[in-house]
Curated annotation (Swiss-Prot):
GO biological process: translation
Protein name: Large ribosomal subunit protein uL16
GO molecular function: structural constituent of ribosome
Species of the source: Thermococcus onnurineus (strain NA1)
PANTHER family reported for this sequence: 60S RIBOSOMAL PROTEIN L10
Top-level taxon of the source organism: Archaea
Gene3D superfamilies, sorted: Ribosomal protein L10e/L16
GO CC terms of this entry: ribonucleoprotein complex; ribosome
Keyword vocabulary terms for this entry: Ribonucleoprotein, Ribosomal protein
Length: 182
């Protein structure tokens, strides 16, 4: 069975389903690396991607974001000139009630009898305005970090926005963007 469309799992409409000790056959996380780049250096700017609304991000999308952003930054900035961190973890267990289709499906299918479903994957639950991922860079590489965030936002189920912070944590997005456009 193939991967279902992401629009099925993107809404936060069901209660949290995370207690793995009660779930038989819960899959393991596909994403295992959450910090990439130069982890020990200090950088001038922090660029973070925030969720515009509450959503669930499947682990496949998180892994795709991780690979894409890390590859883009390594190629354009260099491994020692950035620190990239994914700030969410896929705890939510997704489940599916497999429906039998085809000839004589009524003989061996259960339909809606006991429809709770079997675990098929994991997702990260994100609240409105929560940071999803962060890149720390210096001033010369800020435009590459913004492009990486734009590319990462395309892989999310709902829209997202980025914010730029200085070392003290002050939001300086409008100030930095106004100087970059000149």
């Amino acid at each position: 069975m193939g991967l279902r469309p992401a629009k099925i799992d993107r809404d936060v409409d069901k209660p949290a389903y995370t207690r793995r000790e009660y779930i038989r056959g819960a899959p393991g996380p596909k994403i295992t690396i959450f910090d990439m780049g130069n982890l020990s250096a200090e950088f001038q700017y922090e660029v973070s991607l925030h969720a515009e609304q509450a959503m669930q991000i499947r682990q496949n999308a998180l892994e795709a974001i991780r690979i894409q952003v890390n590859r883009y930054l390594q190629k354009n900035v260099g491994r020692s000139n950035y620190h990239f961190k994914i700030r969410v973890y896929p705890f939510q267990v997704l489940r599916e009630n497999p429906m039998a289709t085809g000839r004589k499906a009524d003989r061996y299918g259960n339909g809606m009898r006991r429809p709770f479903g079997k675990p098929i994957g994991l997702a990260a639950r994100v609240k409105k305005d929560q940071k999803i991922l962060t890149v720390w860079v210096n001033e010369g590489h800020l435009k590459f970090a913004l492009e990486a965030m734009r590319r990462a936002a395309m892989k999310l189920p709902y829209s997202a926005y980025y914010r730029i912070y200085d070392k003290e944590g002050n939001d300086i997005t409008s100030k930095v963007l106004s100087t970059m456009k000149r």
